[in-house]
Amino acid sequence: MDKVTPRYNSGIQRSKGILELAAALYDTSLSRLVTRGGTAVPQINSRLGAGISLRLDTQMVTPTDGELALSFGVDGLRRNLMQVAEKQLSLVWVNPNASLALAYKGCAPFPGPLPLRAIAVFPSWDATVIAVHESTGITSLEQIRERRIPLRVTTRETIKPPFDEDATMFAVNTIINAAGFSLDDICAWGGSVQAVPRPSHPDRSDAIRKGAIDAIFDEGVLSWGQFALERGFRILPVEGAVRERVMAAGYDMITLTPGRIPGLKAPVSSVDFSGWPMIVHADMADDVAYALCEAIEARKLAIPTDNFRPLDLAQLCTIDEETPRGAPLHPGAERFYRERGYLRR
């Protein structure tokens, strides 16, 4: 008798097929190849949104035979991480690791320490920085408040404070508040704020090129840093009392170097925005966390990376400058990495 190739049951066939279809849509005519603003670096943009809310429900109203219902989310800050803590979401994948660190420590915008764990931290090196044009004469963050300088700022979409659903704006706000001012203060002093949806948006690079802005408050510094530095901008160090306040708020620091950002004249300290953690509840069953890691391994060639290198599972469970970890590994994930030889310590 010929060997029969097993296949998924009909319901799973449709569910799995929809997931494959959704992923493939980013490789269709709905997407287009562009370049990052002000650079020749290719980047794919799509008419499809980047937000996702996904539920894998059980096939029966009452789960049988150990069936699981899993739900997934991407990005966000307070709401999504709170939903994982409240077991309304099974997993959320966010940028950056700082969001997980704030939640695990119980720092604002969270009400207290949340029972969260990481199953993986995907590599991404980044920083949130405050950069100003040399023509402003500004060399420190405190000078902006002291001189009440009417800066023309470009930053991200400026949702209303306290910015607790936007990791970028929450970090920016933490830095400038630690220095004693806000975006509203800048506007009150006669300045202005340009909001762009992403760090490399062409509206920003055009404004830099035309001299229409003199300050940049954002992350994604690898996408715009060199371009801005070559046109007279400098990155202000987060140091002294400002640094202490930012770290007390739950953030870690990172050193930017000329090796990372061409055009930088000397190392400068700023706020770490590295790492993309996949986050689950501390109480998730070990076998489910283990299986999630198995799935990452099975699809490692298909999962995009931010560091332009093939996905390395050993890096996902190892703390380094691209993969800081704001909460411990889930025990099920740790067992997977040890058994497969990815985690040796």
Per-range role (PLM):
Residues 111-128, 261-270:
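A structural signal for short loop-to-beta-strand junctions that line the ligand-binding cleft
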Residues 84, 130, 144, 208, ...:
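Residue-level signal for nonpolar/aromatic packing positions in well-ordered secondary structure
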Residues 49, 89, 149, 173, ...:
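Sec-exported extracytoplasmic/periplasmic mature domains
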Residues 86, 114, 125-127, 148, ...:
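Extracytoplasmic
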Residues 5-62, 67-71, 126-204, 304, ...:
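Bilobed "Venus flytrap"/periplasmic-binding protein-like clamshell domains
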Residues 57-111, 202-207, 219-230:
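Pocket-flanking alpha-helical
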Residues 263, 267-345:
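Segments of small-molecule ligand-sensing domains
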Residues 96-98, 106-107, 136, 181-279, ...:
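Pocket-lining segment of extracytoplasmic ligand-binding domains
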